[in-house]
Amino acid sequence: MSIDLEWNGLDSSLASSLIDALNRQLSSTSRPSFIGPIEVTSFDFGSVSPDIELVDLRDIYRDFLEDDEDAEDVEKEAVKESQWTDEEDDFEWISRKAVRGKGLPQDVPAYHLLPPHMRYGRGVPMDMFASTPSLRPTRDIVSVTFPLRVRNGSRPPHQPDGQEPNPHPNLQLHLHITWNSNLRLTLTTSLLINYPSPMFMSLPIKLSVTGLLFNGEVVVAYEGERRRVHFETPPEADEDMPAAAAGTARAGKPLPIGQRLLPSIYIESEIGQADKHVLKNVTRVERFIQDVIRKTIEEELVFPNFHTLVLGDSGS
């Protein structure tokens, strides 16, 4: 079964909201000492929508539910410290990293309740910048929503006998997504030279992501009663997954997860001031940004890591 996104609904006002949300987060994110302030200046969703195939529909993994119970206290405290509330935003974005370490006991495998293709140990991912401060937030607030339309109906997971149907049942979608995107994201920053004194020299940098190719499996779990949506991607295609999601077998050494999910990322770079000498399309800089993007996907969304959207009240 295929799922269609109403891509025309992603207009400029939604892009502006996303830019504002990104810049709010970037302004409070730690950066390496050699990187100046980072600002997103433009964003365009592009004209190409992803090709989404529904591979499987099942009950939600208990790992999502158990992690939610541990995250409740952290989540409530985070909302108190923020100027944003559920009444002002459509949903709240909470990183799993805010509650890491509060899961199952040390001597109990975290994967014992999961199907075979999801049984991977819970671990702490490596930092993409190694010895430099992390550029990842522990909590983000996002105030945008994406219109969704399902082409063909599908039966929800099993409902126990003798119970009234839940208007918002828990269900989990396994999707195979192929997206040859022509989105465009432009940001500016600067390279700081801190010798012989701090900020002795600043070199402007302009980076533009002009497109990417995403090809992989994504798990989307909807927790109806709590109105939460969990996102993650399996670390590897497995024999237990349906053939449509397994993809083409690879010969030789497997590719890194980030490169498998994002085999192509197109980036344009400019270093220097526009009215003076400018270096364009610097290969090393572009490769560095590609590595950062892929590493971020690995550390934020590849199991055992996942993200959760806390939806606002539906009013019903």
Swiss-Prot record:
CDD domains: SMP_Mdm12. GO terms for molecular function: lipid binding. It is found in: Mitochondrion outer membrane; Endoplasmic reticulum membrane. It comes from the Eukaryota. Residues 1-312 form the SMP-LTD domain. GO terms for biological process: mitochondrial genome maintenance; mitochondrion-endoplasmic reticulum membrane tethering; phospholipid transport; protein insertion into mitochondrial outer membrane. Its main location: mitochondrion. It is a peripheral membrane protein. Keywords: Endoplasmic reticulum, Lipid transport, Lipid-binding, Membrane, Mitochondrion, Mitochondrion outer membrane, Transport. GO terms for cellular component: endoplasmic reticulum membrane; ERMES complex. Pfam families: MMM1. Component of the ERMES/MDM complex, which serves as a molecular tether to connect the endoplasmic reticulum (ER) and mitochondria. Components of this complex are involved in the control of mitochondrial shape and protein biogenesis, and function in nonvesicular lipid trafficking between the ER and mitochondria. MDM12 is required for the interaction of the ER-resident membrane protein MMM1 and the outer mitochondrial membrane-resident beta-barrel protein MDM10. The SMP-LTD domain is a barrel-like domain that can bind various types of glycerophospholipids in its interior and mediate their transfer between two adjacent bilayers. Component of the ER-mitochondria encounter structure (ERMES) or MDM complex, composed of MMM1, MDM10, MDM12 and MDM34. A MMM1 homodimer associates with one molecule of MDM12 on each side in a pairwise head-to-tail manner, and the SMP-LTD domains of MMM1 and MDM12 generate a continuous hydrophobic tunnel for phospholipid trafficking. PANTHER family: MITOCHONDRIAL DISTRIBUTION AND MORPHOLOGY PROTEIN 12. Belongs to the MDM12 family. This is Mitochondrial distribution and morphology protein 12. It comes from Postia placenta (strain ATCC 44394 / Madison 698-R) (Brown rot fungus).
